[in-house]
Amino acid sequence: SASLVGSEMCIRDSMQRDMEKDRRIPKDRYEVMVREQAESGNAWEDAKNASDFSIFAPHLEKMIALTKEMAGYTDPGKEVYDVLLDKYEEGMDSATIDRLFGELKEALIPLVKKILAAKQPDDTKFHAYFDPDDQRKVQDLLLSYIGFSKDAGAVGETEHPFTLNFSSKDVRVTNHYYEHDPISAMFSAIHEGGHAIFEQNVNPEYDNTAAGSCRYMGVHESQSRFYENILGRNKNFWIPVYEKVQELMPQMKDISLDEFYREINHVRNSLIRTEADEVTYCFHIILRLSLIHISEPTRLA
């Protein structure tokens, strides 16, 4: 081990850590978990399209029970939420998250109330019909604009946008297009593009190793939300490309850059986290954590 360099030690330690945890899970129970994950994904999509939560509810219940079971195998005696948190944000604990969210909520509640009490802009123009094919063209424009390389990736369509990578040279972005909400696909493209650019810039020497993967979801999400909010909601970001956006999406020709800029920064209450504005987005996360805390300490729902 004395001859290992930093990156090699990272790979070794990460593999050992994951292997020790995974070995504690009975194979047959893990197989049940994987099958239910696949079935749950299909049920969620069916429920979403039918607007019927009852289709997904039993699968959600099973997944919660199985997730708690897996956490009990990997870290027995530890709070379930802390076990899961450590998978996505290594070394983080719920006490730190609670403190952070408490400060955030204290500052955000009066701010949101003040904003919502003000006169709201008219967003009628943004609910006209926007051809999904035109939205795809705008998406491709924006991905190219922010630096996503199609030579090292691809773009597809799914019910829920996400980014998937198999190496730094094969990074796949997905999106969803709503006929009466063009901004959704635009900002999903910018957000997922941020994730993808992170992956495309990983040193190829570290592809498919722990040194080339991000063990801190906060780091990865900081990149996607930097592109989405710090860049994408800045008026200067759109000045070089807005006329091209209008060319690709004819309905946008009746919407000035100032109107567009106001709409992409419009603060409103919403039910969907991924569609939330920059200000209210945090409440979706805080609410989910609150739902965990108001139930049994080790429950997930």
Tell where the protein language model's regions lie, with residue ranges.
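Noncatalytic, helix-rich "gating/capping" subdomain that lines the substrate-entry/channel surface
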Residues: 1, 7-57
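Single conserved hydrophobic/aromatic residue that forms the stacking wall/gate
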Residues: 1-6, 10, 292-301
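Secondary-structure capping and boundary motifs in well-ordered enzyme cores
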Residues: 32, 59-62, 131, 165, ...
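Contiguous, non-catalytic segments that form substrate-binding/exosite surfaces or channel walls
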Residues: 34-184
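An N-terminal structural lobe/cap that precedes and organizes the functional/catalytic core
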Residues: 84, 139-142, 168, 188, ...
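Active-site recognition of the HExxH zinc-binding catalytic motif
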Residues: 187-200, 221-225
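Post-HExxH zinc-binding segment in Zn-dependent metallohydrolases
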Residues: 213-251
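Long, amphipathic alpha-helical stalk/connector segments used for oligomerization, subunit docking
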Residues: 236-291, 295, 299
